[in-house]
């Protein structure tokens, strides 16, 4: 499995509750925070729903 690094680049203030919960599930709680994840179909769906708030890079 391939690893990726997910970085939160925009604040979650004023976004839908579902998006806040998705960021929390990804382990992102504040702007600039990074987490390393293994790529999976479930993760891809989560990243797609909050793509306007995050940046994704290959690890």
From Swiss-Prot:
InterPro entries: Ribo_uL30_ferredoxin-like_sf, Ribosomal_uL30_bac-type, Ribosomal_uL30_CS, Ribosomal_uL30_ferredoxin-like. One of its GO terms (biological process) is translation. The keyword NAD does not apply. Keywords: Ribonucleoprotein, Ribosomal protein. One of its GO terms (molecular function) is structural constituent of ribosome. SUPFAM superfamilies: Ribosomal protein L30p/L7e. One of its GO terms (cellular component) is cytosolic large ribosomal subunit. Pfam families: Ribosomal_L30 (PF00327). NCBIfam families: rpmD_bact (TIGR01308). Part of the 50S ribosomal subunit. HAMAP family: Ribosomal_uL30_B. Belongs to the universal ribosomal protein uL30 family. This is Large ribosomal subunit protein uL30. It comes from Leptospira interrogans serogroup Icterohaemorrhagiae serovar copenhageni (strain Fiocruz L1-130). The gene is rpmD.
């Amino acid at each position: 499995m391939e690893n990726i690094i997910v970085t939160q680049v925009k604040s979650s203030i004023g976004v839908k509750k579902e998006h806040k919960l998705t960021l929390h599930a990804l382990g992102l709680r504040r702007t600039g925070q990074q987490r390393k994840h293994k790529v999976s179909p479930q993760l891809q769906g989560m990243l797609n729903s909050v793509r306007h708030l995050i940046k994704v890079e290959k690890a």
